[in-house]
Design a protein with these regions (language model features):
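Short Cys/His-rich Zn2+-coordinating modules
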Residues: 13, 17-21
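Conserved Radical SAM active-site core
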Residues: 4-11, 23-26, 34-113
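Conserved AdoMet/S-adenosylmethionine-binding subsite of the radical SAM
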Residues: 77-165
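Short linear functional motifs in flexible/disordered or boundary regions
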Residues: 18, 48-51, 68, 126, ...
Length: 165
């Protein structure tokens, strides 16, 4: 049975992206290879508790919500994350994955909404973006940028213009 290291699970109201206002279960996985200067979840870098896929499916069922957001840290840093995403979809949940875009998203179950948080230059991790991820995103997925400055804004704008051409 596959296991994942989990920092926390909790029910919340989605505050950003296209699901704003939805009640969701958050499964925050432990660990992240990035160290963004503005990170607000540094507590998820270490520690956590090992949980099986079955245990996490029970948490989802007991939450009584239909939307599950898998986040981190960087959830894709754990190999079993892909299994968790598919298991949640198979169980009938609407699933989103919040990821940095520094790791490959191509193998994520296509039923999952991939929310890719590209790292801007002033994040301190801008060189870690795996821009090939943009080639596999669909209208079901989303891009996110944390803008720290005008420079970051211009970088994001230029990237989107280049990709749209």
């Amino acid at each position: 049975m596959s296991r994942l290291k989990v920092t926390e699970t909790f029910v919340s109201i989605q505050g950003e992206a296209d699901a704003v206002g939805w009640t969701k279960l958050v499964i925050r996985l432990t660990g992240c290879p990035l160290r963004c200067v503005y990170c607000d979840t540094q507590y998820s870098f270490y520690g956590g508790e090992w949980r099986t896929l079955d245990e996490l499916l029970v948490v989802a069922r007991e939450s009584s919500v239909r939307h599950v957001c898998v986040t981190g840290g960087e959830p894709l840093a754990q190999k079993a994350c892909l299994e968790l995403l598919t298991a949640l979809c198979d169980a009938g949940y609407s699933v989103s994955l919040e990821t940095s875009g520094a790791l490959d998203v191509a193998r994520v179950d296509p039923r999952v909404s991939r929310v890719v948080d590209l790292k801007t230059p002033e994040s301190g991790e801008g060189k870690r973006n795996m821009l090939e991820n943009l080639d596999v995103l669909t209208s079901h997925d989303q891009l996110k940028f944390v803008l720290c400055s005008r420079t970051d804004y211009e970088w994001a704008r230029d990237l989107l213009r280049e990709r749209a051409a």
